A protein has these predicted regions:
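Extended, folded cores of ATP/NTP-driven motor/assembly subunits in large transport
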Residues: 1-259
């Protein structure tokens, strides 16, 4: 609905693996969250620029005999992730601190019973009302965690694979993509880290078959974060020379067409 003139077409699968290069020239890995998933990455609402331009620049470095692919796969996650976010904010506020020993807790209760007859009611009420004073950084984190939990969450797998004459060249191509993803890094919150995989045959197989393991619930992004990573290229933000665009548009036919006459 955000792109009413967009048209989807089914195409043949692109083969990014060079026919002349061997498996030794393949490199790849995954981009995972650098911190716990409750912390959000930097989105378009904060950066105010289109991050897809840097990704397109990274892919423009690929030569004719080389190949590189970026897979972004996601699926709805269990709504329980919002409870984890709520628990994290409570911990930051200091509301869920538990004693490390039941014996210490019993001693504290006994001390309270002994002091109670000699302690003025005002002093007791004052001690109960004492709350943790949050720092500016803690307030920012609490607000960011709550804001992320407002939107639907998705388990995400981001895989990048490159094929060239040598592994060093493939890693250099991947380095451009990793650098482009640094735009989503937030100093005090979250970002992405690149995890290189050593099994080259497994990298190629997982990429071809789009393998999405079940244990990827540590990488959870909401709909705003996903839209920041991938969206249809904006004509105003992305130069026309970098993206192949349609020269014609398909329009719907008239509703009432005469059947005779």
């Amino acid at each position: 609905s955000a792109y009413p003139t967009a048209r989807l077409e089914e195409i043949f699968e692109d083969n990014i693996f060079s026919k002349t290069s061997e498996i030794t020239g393949v490199a790849g890995g995954e981009l995972a969250l650098s911190r716990e998933f409750v912390y959000p990455i930097a989105t378009y609402e904060e950066t105010k620029w289109d991050a897809s331009g840097a990704l397109i620049n990274a892919f423009s470095m690929v030569k004719n005999h080389e190949g590189m692919g970026l897979q972004l796969m996601f699926r709805p996650t269990d709504p329980i992730w919002t409870k984890v976010s709520s628990e994290r904010t409570q911990n930051l506020k200091g509301g869920n601190k538990k004693s490390g020993s039941s014996g210490i807790a019993i001693v504290d209760i006994a001390k309270g019973l002994v002091r109670a007859p000699f302690e003025p009611p005002e002093a007791a009420d004052k001690s109960k009302k004492q709350e943790k004073v949050l720092t500016a950084d803690e307030q920012t984190k609490i607000q960011a965690i709550d804001e992320k939990a407002k939107y639907p969450g998705f388990e995400v797998l981001i895989r990048v694979v490159a094929s060239s004459d040598s592994e060093a060249r493939s890693e250099a191509l991947i380095g451009g993509v990793v650098s482009a993803f640094s735009q989503f890094n937030s100093t005090s919150l979250n970002g992405f880290k690149y995890e290189m995989l050593k099994d080259k045959e497994k990298i190629a197989r997982d990429f071809i078959f789009r393998l999405f393991p079940q244990n990827k619930n540590k990488n959870i992004l909401n709909s705003v974060e996903l839209a920041s990573i991938y969206h249809l290229p904006n004509r105003g933000a992305i130069p026309t020379s970098q993206v192949e665009r349609q020269t014609v548009k398909q329009v719907d036919g008239p509703v009432k067409i005469p059947k005779d006459g």
